[in-house]
Amino acid sequence: DSGPTFVVNNDRLGGVDWVFNGWGDHTAFDWSRDANIASEILRMTGAERRPSPLVNEGGGIAVNGKGDVLLTETVQLDPGRNPTASKTSVEQEIHHQLGTERAVWFERGLWRDYQNHGTRGHVDIVAAFVPDGSVLLHRQFDTSHPDSKLWQNQCRALEEAGFKVRALPAPRIARDNIDWVDYSYVNHYVGNGFVLLPAFRDRTDEHALEILKDLYPDRHVTNLDARVLFAMGGGIHCITQQQPLVV
């Protein structure tokens, strides 16, 4: 989340250095040193630094490389992050930095993400673009879970933007020893030749694995127990950043 968002322009590697302020200062931990991680990574990689005045995190955006970006109102418009921002000003800065042209907004993210250690609605646990041009969308089928109410509006927003939506079911595990969980297979990492998918020791793990294998036939898809990461408010995609290979 605190790392740079890598971009490529005319075969030159760059990285957007967003302002990081601890997810709108929504954490009990000291994040002051985390705020310097992006610039340090860019120095180490030799990528061109593109500073941005926008408070944003890696998990707060999802892009398809074709001009589209997914955003969440409770993240980019969070008073603790960007108190004077509007959708228009956010989109202008996002498009300027990433080269995107169109934004699709969700009202909010998953319920647990608003509790302790949460990000207040990161989109990378809700939706992800896949190679065939469709969007994987987290779907909670347990109607007692608060996240079950999100599907209709999020699906409508994507379909109105012209996207085919693929449901990626939530694990059947709905609660841990604290409260409702935000376990999500959407929060996966795509690397060169592989896809790393979260697992939760749930019978839905294998079903999700097969869905991702069908979508990434040219990559080895494997899964890894991610319950500890999710317990602390993160996930596999949350703790990684995609750096494109530029030679």
Language-model segments: which ranges?
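The feature marks the mature, well-folded catalytic cores of soluble enzymes
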Residues: D1-V247
